[in-house]
Amino acid sequence: RGLGDVYKRQINNGDFVRLNFTGKIKENDEIFDTTFEDVAKEAGLFDENKEYKPIPIIVGGNHLLPAIEEAIVGLEAGDSKTIEIDSENAFGPRNKQLIQLIPMKEFKRQGMTPVPGMKITSEGSTGKILTVNGGRVKVDFNHELAGKDLIFDVDVTEIIDNDEDKIKSMIELHYAAPNMDINKTVIDIDGDVVNITLDDVAKFDQKSYMDVTFARFRIAKDIWENMDFEKVNFVDSFEKKQEEDEEEAEE
C-alpha cells in the first residue's frame, strides 16, 4: 500500500483500528470469545451466523472492555499483546443480590418450563437458571464472567486512516448483517455532512425498526465524536431497474 508498508505509527486514543482477539478465563484457560474461526470450533463456540475476522473498534470508544482499549495504546499495526484484566476491571465482582428466587407460577404464566442452564430475560436483564426446586426457580442475573479474572490475546491488524474506511468500519461494527456487502455501501462526504447509502440487503433486513434505528444512531454518534463531521444522513432509495428488452433490441 505504498507508504503504508513502510510508515508505522503508534496507536492513540481515538484511532480506528482492526484487531483479532481471544478471551480466556484466567483460572482455567477456558475460551469464551474469539475472532478466529478455528479457535471457536476447537472451543465449541462456533456460530455459523457469525463472521470470523478482525473487528473494527475506536480506541477509547468503549467498544471493548476499557482495559483492553487502554492496553493497546502505543502498539503498532502488526503488534500482539497478552492483556490480563482482574475481575474489578472486567465485568465486576459477583453480586449476591442479583441471584433471585422466582416463583414457578411466573414461568407457567408465560408458557415456559424452566430447566437449569436456561437463559431468560426479565425486565431487560439476562439471567441463567441455576436450580429448579418445587415451586421456586433460582436465577443468577450476574454477567457470566462476573468475578472472573480474564486474559485477552490481542493482535492489531490495521490502523485505519482513510475517512471513508473509518465510516465503513463503524457500519461493520454496529450494523452486522451477514449478507451485507460493505463494499456496496456508498459513502458521500460533503463538507461536514456524511451521506450513507447502505447495501440493498440492509433495506430488507429482518431487524426490528428499533434495532435498526439504534444501530444507525450508534454509527452516527461514533462519527460525530471521533471525526470532523456534524451530520450523518442515511439514504434509503428505491430505483426502478431498466431491463433490456432483448426482443426489440436491434441485431
Predicted regions: what they are:
Residues 13-31, 68, 75-108, 114-161:
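FKBP-type peptidyl-prolyl cis-trans isomerase
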Residues 224-246:
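A short amphipathic beta-strand at an alpha->beta junction
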